[in-house]
Amino acid sequence: MIKLTQEEQKYLLDSIRIIPDFPKKGIIFRDITTLLNNKEALNFLLKHLKERYKDYNLDFIAGTESRGFIFASMICAKLNLPFVPIRKPGKLPFETFSCEYDLEYGSDKVELHKDAFKNIQNARVLLVDDLIATGGTAIASYELIQKAGAKCVEACFLMNLKDLNGANKLEKLTSVYSVLEI
C-alpha cells in the first residue's frame, strides 16, 4: 500500500494552518483552507490518493458532510467514480437510512439515501473525511454504508488525531488510512 514519506507528510502538514483555542480554549484547530488554496500541495495530495486507490476496484466514494465532500469529490474526479454524500439529518430529499452517534454532550445523526449505491449489493466503497477524532461520525458513516448493502473497503482521512483513538476504533470494522498522523 502506498504511503507518504515523513518528508512528504511534513510538506502537507506545513500547508495546513494551525489556529490555537478555536473554536474554544484548549482546542488546536487544523484549518484545511490553506491546503485547499495551495495548488501545489493540493495536487500533490490528490496525486498520492489517486495512486493509492487506483487499483482498489472501487464502485463509489462516499464523503461525510461537509469537509469530507471536498476531498471525496476531488478523488472521484481523479478516479472517474461517482460520489455519494453522507449528510446531516434532514438534508437529503429522498428516503434515507440514518445512524445516531454519541458526542461529548449529546448525540447526532448522519443519513444516506437508501438507493445511494444504486442497489448494487456489495458495492465497493471508499469512505472519505478530512479528519478522524473520536470516530463517532466515521463509525456511523461506515454503518450506513453497510445498511445500504455496500462494503466499505477502506476509510481515508487527511488527518488522524491519534490521541483521541477514533482510528483504532474504526479499524475494528474496516481498513483505515490517514495521510497525516497528528
Swiss-Prot record:
Reactions this protein catalyses: AMP + diphosphate = 5-phospho-alpha-D-ribose 1-diphosphate + adenine
GO annotation, cellular component aspect: cytoplasm
Pathway, per record: Purine metabolism; AMP biosynthesis via salvage pathway; AMP from adenine: step 1/1
Annotated PROSITE patterns: PUR_PYR_PR_TRANSFER
EC code: 2.4.2.7
A GO MF label: adenine binding
EC class of the enzyme, as a word: transferase
Example of a GO biological process term: AMP salvage
Pfam (any one): Pribosyltran
Entries under InterPro entries matching the protein: Ade_phspho_trans, PRibTrfase_dom, PRTase-like, UPRTase/APRTase
Protein purpose: Catalyzes a salvage reaction resulting in the formation of AMP, that is energically less costly than de novo synthesis.
Annotated NCBIfam families: apt (TIGR01090), PRK02304.1-3 (NF002634), PRK02304.1-5 (NF002636)
Name of this chain's protein: Adenine phosphoribosyltransferase
Organism: Campylobacter jejuni subsp. doylei (strain ATCC BAA-1458 / RM4099 / 269.97)
Organism lineage string: Bacteria, Pseudomonadati, Campylobacterota, Epsilonproteobacteria, Campylobacterales
Gene name of the record: apt
